[in-house]
């Protein structure tokens, strides 16, 4: 499993990665919304559970400045 965090400022984070069970996934967190995870998690999407498409994942990764090498591996359907 991989898990990468991009600090978006203002207590917000973009988290993304690859998991053998979930496939590609991403989450958006707002850490100013409370103390519990269920209060702070804004978006939670994965290939397996939410049918996250490769196109949507690439779009979101570009929007939140994910690492270029991760985008390249994603485009080739490889884990990162």
Stretch-by-stretch model annotation:
Residues 34-80:
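Mixed-charge, Lys/Arg-enriched low-complexity segments
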């Amino acid at each position: 499993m991989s898990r990468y965090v991009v600090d978006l400022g203002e207590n917000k984070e973009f988290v993304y990665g690859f998991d053998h069970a979930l496939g590609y996934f991403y989450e958006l967190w707002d850490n100013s919304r409370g103390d519990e995870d269920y209060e702070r998690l804004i978006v939670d999407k994965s290939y397996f559970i939410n049918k996250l498409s490769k196109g949507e994942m690439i779009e979101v990764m570009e929007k939140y400045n994910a690492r270029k090498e991760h985008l390249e591996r994603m485009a080739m359907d490889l884990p990162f």
